[in-house]
C-alpha cells in the first residue's frame, strides 16, 4: 500500500507524515512531496523512526515520482489561514494548486483514492472533480474532502462539556467544511442531553473552531496538528477499506444531490472507495433550520469551484 502526502513540508503535512510513519500497516510505502526543498530532509528525519514503513521525500515542481503507484493521495498543499482571513481568501492561491495537482493525478495515478485537505474544501473538491472529469478519469467513489477535523473537534468539545471520555463520544457532522456549512448533529449523540443554549453554543464553537486556533496562534499559523491527526484518521480509514475492511467515516463526497452535489455525510468505505452513502438519520428542528440556512452558501462554494475549472 502506497500513501502519498502532497504538501508534506507544511505544518499539516509534517504532522500527518509523522503520524502515518507510526501508524500505517507494516510494509506500507509513504511518499512525501512538496515544492519546498526541505522535503527530502523531512523524509530523512522521519526515516529514523523505527517502524516498518518505508519513506521517501521528493521536492521541486513535479510531484510525479511521489504519485507513481499511489493507492491513497492526501493533499494538504497550499497556503494557511492567517488572522483576519477566512477560508474564501485562501481560494485565490489554493484553487490553482489543487487544479494543477489534480491534473497530474489524472495522468499518473488516476485510480488512487484522493483525500483533499487544502481549504476551502467546499470548493477545492469540486475543482478536483472537474479536472478529473475533463481527463475522463473521474470516479466519484474515490474523491473525498477530509472533514474529519470537524468530527474530532465535535467529539472533543462534547466530551469536555459533559465530562466524558472523548474516545467514547461519537458526533455525526454533515454539510460542508467551513463556517455555517459545518453541522454537528448533536441531537444524535447517544447518552447525552443538551439544553437549547448548549446546542447553540456548541454548534457555533465547532463552526468557528478553526478561527479559534488561528487567533490563538497570533499570526503563527492555523490548525495544523489537530488537522494532521484528523487527516491521519481518515487516511488510515481509506487504507483499511482498500485492504478489505468495512469502515464507516464522514467525508465530503459527491452524493445523490439531495441538498448539494457535494455534501459531508457518513460513508461506508470499501475496496473501491465509497461503497455506500449512508443516511444521516432524523434531524432536530434546530438542525433542519441550520441545514436549510447553509445550503445557499454550500451550493455557492461548489459553483465557484466548477466555474474555476470551466
Curated annotation (Swiss-Prot):
Role description: Catalyzes the reversible oxidation of malate to oxaloacetate.
Catalysis performed (reactions):
(S)-malate + NAD(+) = oxaloacetate + NADH + H(+)
Q: Which PANTHER family did the record assign? A: MALATE AND LACTATE DEHYDROGENASE, MALATE DEHYDROGENASE, MITOCHONDRIAL
Q: Name one GO cellular component term.
A: cytoplasm
Which terms under GO biological process does the entry name? malate metabolic process; tricarboxylic acid cycle
Q: Which residues form the active site?
A: 177 (proton acceptor)
The organism's lineage?
Bacteria, Pseudomonadati, Pseudomonadota, Gammaproteobacteria, Vibrionales
Which UniProt keywords are present, listed alphabetically? NAD, Oxidoreductase, Tricarboxylic acid cycle
Write the Enzyme Commission number(s) for this entry: 1.1.1.37
Instruction: Cite the Pfam families for this sequence.
Output: Ldh_1_C (PF02866), Ldh_1_N (PF00056)
Q: Which GO terms describe its molecular function?
A: L-malate dehydrogenase (NAD+) activity
**Which family does the UniProt entry place this protein in?**
Belongs to the LDH/MDH superfamily. MDH type 1 family.
What this protein is called in its record is Malate dehydrogenase
Keyword Ligase assigned: no
* Residues engaged in binding substrate: 81, 87, 119, 153
What species does this protein belong to?
A: Vibrio vulnificus (strain YJ016)
Where on this chain does NAD(+) bind?
7-13, 34, 94, 117-119, 227
Oligomeric form and interacting partners: Homodimer.
Amino acid at each position: 500500500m502506497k500513501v502519498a502526502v502532497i504538501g508534506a513540508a507544511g505544518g499539516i503535512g509534517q504532522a500527518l507524515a509523522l503520524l502515518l510513519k507510526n501508524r500505517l500497516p507494516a510494509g506500507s510505502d509513504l511518499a512525501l512531496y512538496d515544492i519546498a526543498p526541505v522535503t527530502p530532509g523531512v523524509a530523512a528525519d522521519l526515516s529514523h523512526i523505527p517502524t516498518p514503513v518505508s519513506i521517501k521525500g521528493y521536492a521541486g515542481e513535479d510531484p510525479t515520482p511521489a504519485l507513481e503507484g499511489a493507492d491513497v493521495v492526501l493533499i494538504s498543499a497550499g497556503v494557511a489561514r492567517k488572522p483576519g482571513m477566512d477560508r474564501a481568501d485562501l481560494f485565490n492561491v489554493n484553487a490553482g494548486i489543487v487544479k494543477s495537482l489534480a491534473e497530474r493525478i489524472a495522468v499518473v495515478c488516476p485510480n488512487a483514492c484522493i483525500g483533499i485537505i487544502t481549504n476551502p474544501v467546499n470548493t477545492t473538491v469540486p475543482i478536483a472533480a472537474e479536472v478529473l472529469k475533463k481527463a475522463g478519469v473521474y470516479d466519484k467513489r474515490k474523491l473525498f474532502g477530509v472533514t474529519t477535523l470537524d468530527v474530532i473537534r465535535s467529539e472533543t468539545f462534547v466530551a469536555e462539556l459533559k465530562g466524558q471520555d472523548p474516545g467514547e463520544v461519537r458526533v455525526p457532522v454533515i454539510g460542508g467544511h467551513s463556517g455555517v456549512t459545518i453541522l454537528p448533529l448533536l441531537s444524535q449523540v447517544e447518552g447525552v442531553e443538551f439544553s437549547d443554549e448548549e446546542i447553540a453554543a456548541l454548534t457555533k464553537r465547532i463552526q468557528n473552531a478553526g478561527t479559534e486556533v488561528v487567533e490563538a496562534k497570533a499570526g503563527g499559523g492555523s490548525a495544523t496538528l489537530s488537522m494532521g491527526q484528523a487527516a491521519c484518521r481518515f487516511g488510515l480509514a481509506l487504507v483499511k477499506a482498500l485492504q478489505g475492511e468495512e469502515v464507516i467515516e464522514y467525508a465530503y463526497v459527491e452524493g445523490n444531490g439531495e441538498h448539494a452535489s457535494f455534501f459531508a455525510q457518513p460513508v461506508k468505505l470499501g475496496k473501491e472507495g465509497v461503497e455506500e452513502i449512508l443516511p444521516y438519520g432524523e434531524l432536530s428542528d434546530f438542525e433542519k433550520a441550520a441545514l436549510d440556512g447553509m445550503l445557499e452558501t454550500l451550493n455557492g462554494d461548489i459553483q465557484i469551484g466548477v466555474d474555476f475549472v470551466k
